Design a protein with these regions (language model features):
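Helix-loop junctions at membrane interfaces in 12-TM secondary transporters
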Residues: 93-107, 314-326
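Multi-pass alpha-helical transporter architecture, strongest
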Residues: 4, 93-95, 191-202, 389-411
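A membrane-interface helix-boundary motif in multi-pass transporters
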Residues: 74, 163-190, 377-395
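Intracellular juxtamembrane helix-capping segments at the cytosolic ends
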Residues: 117-131, 335-348
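Structural signature of the two symmetry-related core transmembrane helices
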Residues: 76-91, 297-312
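Short amphipathic helix-loop junctions that connect adjacent transmembrane helices
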Residues: 21-42, 251-268
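Helix-to-loop junctions at the C-terminal end of transmembrane segments
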Residues: 58-72, 282-294, 379
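Juxtamembrane intracellular "pre-TM" segments in multi-pass secondary transporters
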Residues: 1-5, 204-237
Length: 411
């Protein structure tokens, strides 16, 4: 299989965890059925997401450095972290709809989310290796995200038709004790693992990388600070703010839809299907625009669109208006993620991709507790609308910082 497509298929797999577990299915189930209070459950979920961010920030750069140092380290880290993600995620099956399972569910969320982030950092570090040419990095990144968004649609349709919408889910799963919702976690793990196999086997059987001299903390520091703040350092600082805001959107979007507008699981699946199709198309187009123009421009336009979407969401008077607001999010968030990954790969030397994407993960997690904790706390004391609206501040700060970022022609 072409390495570019094996790379893209991994995105098909991990999208199931990101979309179904983190946001639109299991997060609302936790808040509404396990906690029994959507507002309080939303706060718990956001706080746990923030705690994951702290741990990723403390460990990802060093794991990335290890991956650069050890022979075939990046693919080894990818395999281990991916397997741990799918195994731990399957344990959501035991999260029954009782408040006695609050701590258990949050622990599973914490561990699976942590290993997912490490897996994702390793995956991103292999972007350049997955591209046939350096001037095709944007297209490879865009293809990956596009396949992830569109490829997950059959999975969502299966969940909708055979588990959620039907009166008698497959395998005689009982709706009364939410077995049908909990079983989705097992399906997510299976889906993720199956689509991760092509990439894991391709790189494992491919050209072997050699063991390198160990990288010190000083060498990691030089990537972002070399007598002055480097271009990479400036970009990562700007990314800290918009990545925080995106985390809130991803982990809190489903809970917000349930708490404010009363969306049902069936309606959430429908939103996901349409939104993913929109995101897939715009992300694929964005990948070509990355190579034709520049990633910074794509990032800034995407952030501007997300700012508009935040205000549209919190002012939505109806489910219908909220639905179309989410389509704007879908059209912007994919190109933003793809362009960010592309820019990071281009401004980082080939032999530092592991540690560079470890820092990339750090930039989305170093203050990742700020966005979720800010949104969660404002949600707890004020309202879900106010908590969600607060992320526009983070988007605006990042937009200002990116406007000051200077890139050379090569980047």
């Amino acid at each position: 299989m072409n390495k570019k497509y094996s790379y893209g298929l991994f995105d098909v797999g991990n999208s199931a965890y990101l979309i179904v577990t983190l946001s639109f299915i299991f997060a609302p189930y936790f808040a509404r059925e396990i906690v029994g209070d959507v507002q309080l459950g939303s706060a718990y979920w956001q706080w746990t997401s923030g705690a994951v961010g702290i741990l990723v920030a403390l460990t990802a750069p060093f794991i990335g450095s290890y991956a650069d140092h050890v022979a075939n380290g990046r693919i080894k880290v990818l395999i281990v972290s991916t397997v741990l993600t799918v195994l731990i995620n399957a344990l959501f099956w035991f999260s029954q709809a009782r408040d006695s399972f609050i701590v258990y569910t949050l622990l599973i969320f914490f561990l699976s989310s942590y290993f997912f982030e490490i897996s994702n950092a390793s995956y991103n570090s292999l972007l350049r290796d997955s591209s046939n040419k350096k001037d095709e990095i944007g297209r490879t990144s865009g293809l990956g995200y596009a396949l992830g968004y569109i490829g997950i649609v059959p999975f969502l349709l299966f969940i909708l038709l055979f588990i959620i919408k039907t009166d008698q889910p497959i395998l005689d799963l009982q709706k009364e004790n939410f077995e049908h919702i909990r079983f989705i976690a097992i399906l997510v793990s299976f889906w993720f693992f199956i689509f991760a196999i092509p990439m894991m086997t391709f790189f494992w059987k491919g050209k072997k990388s050699k063991k390198k001299k160990y990288t010190s903390i000083k060498d990691i520091k030089k990537i972002i600070w070399n007598n002055k703040l480097t271009t990479t350092g400036k970009f990562l600082i700007a990314r800290i703010f918009y990545a925080d805001a995106v985390i809130v959107m991803q982990t809190g979007g489903g809970v917000y839809a349930v708490g404010v507008h009363g969306f049902t699981p069936k309606e959430l699946i429908f939103i996901l299907i349409v939104g993913n199709l929109v995101a897939g198309v715009f992300t694929y187009i964005g990948g070509y625009l990355n190579d034709k123009f520049n990633s910074k421009m794509i990032i800034m336009w995407s952030i501007a669109a997300l700012i508009l979407s935040v205000f549209a969401i919190v002012s939505s008077p109806s489910k219908e208006f909220f639905f179309f607001s989410l389509l704007l999010v879908a059209a912007a968030i994919g190109p933003l993620q793809s362009a960010s990954r592309t820019l990071m790969s281009r401004i980082s030397p080939q032999n530092t991709q592991g540690k560079s994407f470890g820092l990339y993960a750090l930039s989305s997690k170093a203050t990742a507790f700020v966005g979720p904790l800010m949104a969660g706390t404002i949600t707890y004391f004020v309202s879900q609308q106010a908590g969600f609206a607060s992320i526009s501040i983070l988007f605006l700060v990042s937009l200002f910082m990116l406007s000051k970022l200077e890139l050379n022609d090569k980047n």
